Amino acid sequence: MSGRVCLECGSPHPGAGDFCADGCRTAFNNRRKARGAELYDLFMAHRFDRTRARQLRVLQAMNRLASNWRAEDHERRGSRRSWRLPQDVLETRPYLRAIVTIDRTGRRAQR
């Protein structure tokens, strides 16, 4: 058996994936969904309502959420990570790496 461990329950498993069973994958993704819902509004304010976000210290709040979630991972999940690897996210969404430029006429172009 390889040294792979399920990201959710911590059980060793022989597969190539990150989870030993569908239930573990579902629990992992449900936790990501709930945490993401908490983070979404704060991030959008941080990005698009910068003045108010600074006044309310939104970036500090987002960092506190992440720290609390990581502490929860250490406490309840044997320190296993609770996020997808950045390269996996970017691999499935190549448009996130695109560079958008605007020419003199105001047209957008992607490289």
Predicted ranges, named:
Residues 32-111:
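Long, charged interaction segments in nuclear RNA/chromatin-associated proteins
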Residues 1-34:
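BZIP DNA-binding basic region
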